[in-house]
Amino acid sequence: MKVTKVGGISHKKYTSEGRLVKSESEENRTDERLSALLNMRLDMYIKNPSSTETKENQKRIGKLKKFFSNKMVYLKDNTLSLKNGKKENIDREYSETDILESDVRDKKNFAVLKKIYLNENVNSEELEVFRNDIKKKLNKINSLKYSFEKNKANYQKINENNIEKVEGKSKRNIIYDYYRESAKRDAYVSNVKEAFDKLYKEEDIAKLVLEIENLTKLEKYKIREFYHEIIGRKNDKENFAKIIYEEIQNVNNMKELIEKVPDMSELKKSQVFYKYYLDKEELNDKNIKYAFCHFVEIEMSQLLKNYVYKRLSNISNDKIKRIFEYQNLKKLIENKLLNKLDTYVRNCGKYNYYLQDGEIATSDFIARNRQNEAFLRNIIGVSSVAYFSLRNILETENENDITGRMRGKTVKNNKGEEKYVSGEVDKIYNENKKNEVKENLKMFYSYDFNMDNKNEIEDFFANIDEAISSIRHGIVHFNLELEGKDIFAFKNIAPSEISKKMFQNEINEKKLKLKIFRQLNSANVFRYLEKYKILNYLKRTRFEFVNKNIPFVPSFTKLYSRIDDLKNSLGIYWKTPKTNDDNKTKEIIDAQIYLLKNIYYGEFLNYFMSNNGNFFEISKEIIELNKNDKRNLKTGFYKLQKFEDIQEKIPKEYLANIQSLYMINAGNQDEEEKDTYIDFIQKIFLKGFMTYLANNGRLSLIYIGSDEETNTSLAEKKQEFDKFLKKYEQNNNIKIPYEINEFLREIKLGNILKYTERLNMFYLILKLLNHKELTNLKGSLEKYQSANKEEAFSDQLELINLLNLDNNRVTEDFELEADEIGKFLDFNGNKVKDNKELKKFDTNKIYFDGENIIKHRAFYNIKKYGMLNLLEKIADKAGYKISIEELKKYSNKKNEIEKNHKMQENLHRKYARPRKDEKFTDEDYESYKQAIENIEEYTHLKNKVEFNELNLLQGLLLRILHRLVGYTSIWERDLRFRLKGEFPENQYIEEIFNFENKKNVKYKGGQIVEKYIKFYKELHQNDEVKINKYSSANIKVLKQEKKDLYIRNYIAHFNYIPHAEISLLEVLENLRKLLSYDRKLKNAVMKSVVDILKEYGFVATFKIGADKKIGIQTLESEKIVHLKNLKKKKLMTDRNSEELCKLVKIMFEYKMEEKKSEN
């Protein structure tokens, strides 16, 4: 679904349904705005000023454009009339020479436009020249009105003999309904093949391909003509069509018509049957065949349209040959039509669940369900990351799904004997892993766990398990009853004592104030701002965590980065922090950003976005500045003119309108035009913010850093404050020094979250997520809020904001051993095993300072969220190791990097903003090239040495696995809908998908896959071949190879980790096969992987062989283009190193070596 506008009316466009639906917010204004479509502005007939060469003509045509933008032709009672727009008429001098024939897009309109311009009377007959354009608009309006009235899908729920079922009511659906049962599938396919053979001979298709190969852009009509000859359309002349139509009036069935008109082509027979007889004759296996030529030809025409008539430049002749090879073409069309039949059956099942008797599936109804499903699938990453983190904390070797297995339980065997089965928590104690698990828990929850209290620990792990399972069973296992807003309800889960203490401590007022104090210290505020100024800032600032979900509000960091460039044009007073020491300058900027950011997101947005703010005053000022720019005054044309007529009176609605315009036009405009929207909004907020600071006496923050010399009392306190904060983390009972308390007393907080059990469980989940997943979750919840216009997830978003105060901070006291780092180090051909070897290896003190291991953030993340052993195996296979030489090179390059950054910065300024008499020379070009090459080399080396590349690899792998889990959820949903659609009378289908087997009547054992296999065997009990597909021997092989239904379990239960029994490429192959019932879904798998790779800076091409095996054709780094508009050879650097590209390629190919059988 996407939002669009047609003639100024907001719609939701459902591309799969092909219809436009009124947006709810527009319902009351639709008729009025539809009528407004008939008002046609005449400036559309005047050429753009920029299309002329001379400045005089640009200015003259600009004035014409402006004049005619206020003149409209409208239709009333079938008569055309002229009227003025809303703008006031301005007295002006005019002359016949002001408007020339060359200024008008179409010469036939020139005479009447000239009369209008010269203020001469124009009658309705003269206005008839615009009739055709008005007619086109009228057709558009009628189409829209029909769309609104037809605002429904062709499905209705009925009750037939006490069996609730859904049927399609369109003509196509009548055909599909005839073949609803899978037993008729073979006959359906046979009819498709037969129709294809009737329409197309192999030699004709071969000739068609030759014609396409020799095609030029201007000769596409020849392909159409040749194709029409193939299907016999040229023989159906107009008089022949009249003969057929006359006969149809007197003939009641297709057979009789063919007898009377025997010369009809196969296609014409099919089209006539579909149009005139399909819903009149009683369908049987014989007459229904008539419909299939029509179906096949539609698919063929669509292929020609996509690959020939509207052929894209990236479609090669080889691809055309493959697609249109006779047997391939036949199979492709067969699959497409089979997919459509399957989709119909699934839709019948879907609407059976959601509709009441007699109810029709409307487009709005469909959209709501799609939106809910899409939102829930976006949350899959939450459950999968949390699940991986749980496994990592437990250090479990269990390859099976561990949810529901925290506690041990007593079970009975076949003989009735009781046996205790250990839970995952039991294993911590049985395998003596208490210390390791305690350290792992501390990395996530920063809490001092008492591992000697086993019951308390078991309750805590059970809480985490229940919270994860609650989400997984709602999403991964597709819960029909679950609404998006209830995904984090965590019903019937009581927080354990540890959970309560931990969460209550997190939302404690004193702890929150200390977090803010830590941020002030980290941002170097105490070093660069005098004490009395800090205290004054704190007195005037309120720190809030409430989420401000406002569309199109620019981030503060984006605005800050543009202040220097925009300060003159916007009339802003600004002093950029600058010292002789680059590090010091950066620290001052960090402090300034932190202090200003709190004001921006707090009191400023509260004021600016309110009805009492000056939002509209500032926005008008920005438009006026653009309008009065010297260059625009000459032409009379200015970019921001398009925003002048926006009528919304509330800032939030104004922004939503601009965001809508941006999204609608994004695909049809060049980058410069798209940037206009973002640039306009950024200027409004930047000007508004700086005005707010000036009006509220807070501009003094501009001068931060200038009083450093007088701030001796706090300048050197950073480390002292850090030490205290670390001690306080370990013991909250220690006394807070007066010096810190003085600041804490002045920190004011907004409303603090109140404790609820639901938020307590949500908190446990959040602490298991990495920073990226937490950001994605926040975005998903904000989008849900916006789409549903409700306050759902407000508390959850506030909690995320609260945790973001320090969620991505590295805990310094996490355990890190030399042999863990040593897995990726090359010490004379071996891995480093202990501190002694690490000291010898690392003479540059990058990993070891002589006494202690230096802890890099990336390795902290790898240990906390990662797959250390799997990463080691992938790195070993890729030959990826850090050498002593690389450490030395890194240390040397580190000393030179500031010089290279400075060189790039200065030369880029010279290129982008040259001073008077300054020119970017060839020598500058070469120096810039050398600087960016040095920076690239250093950056890649740094990312390797500091383990950033391994951390990226882990994040990439995890992201791909999350996405694949989403596909298994869709498969489960589709299976459920297909079975319900095909067998609406079967009352036991729901038991296949019910997890509480003890409540089931028929399917009492096993998970979804096992229960479905039982159903499958019952369905095909008389077909030995199909039953044998899931024999015990075959199931054993399928499980081992993770094929067929068992790839679903392998992905959904996250069994790829830790051992990678099959490669990621094989996972993709097997998943595509599982999804082969839907071509779009199957093809989407690889597209989503390519998109994820692109997000991480890789450009990949996969190849799929005739045997359906997937391989990597190319995998390269994304290129970063520098000095884009310079008329020289493009300067490009690689975002990722070649070594990392190789590592990613190996990641896709890696799988655990098979154990050799012992003989």
Swiss-Prot record:
UniProt-annotated stretches for the region NTD: 1-170
Documented effect of changing K1087A: Wild-type pre-crRNA cleavage
Similarity remark: Belongs to the CRISPR-associated endoribonuclease Cas13a family.
Impact when changing R1135A: Decreased cleavage of target RNA
Full protein name: CRISPR-associated endoribonuclease Cas13a
Variant or mutagenesis effect after changing R311A: 60% pre-crRNA cleavage
Binds 3'-end of target RNA, in adjacent protein: annotated segments: 995-998
Species whose genome carries this gene: Leptotrichia buccalis (strain ATCC 14201 / DSM 1135 / JCM 12969 / NCTC 10249 / C-1013-b)
Region (Linker): 814-946
Biotech / industrial applications: Can be used to detect low levels of cellular transcripts, which might be useful to create sequence-specific RNA-targeting tools.
Domain notes: The X-ray structure in complex with crRNA and target RNA shows a crRNA-recognition lobe (REC, residues 1-360) which anchors the crRNA repeat and a nuclease lobe (NUC, residues 361-1159) which binds the spacer crRNA-target RNA duplex and cleaves target RNA. The target ssRNase active sites are within the 2 HEPN-like folds, which interact in vivo to form the functional active site. The N-terminal region and HEPN-like fold 2 play a role in pre-crRNA processing.
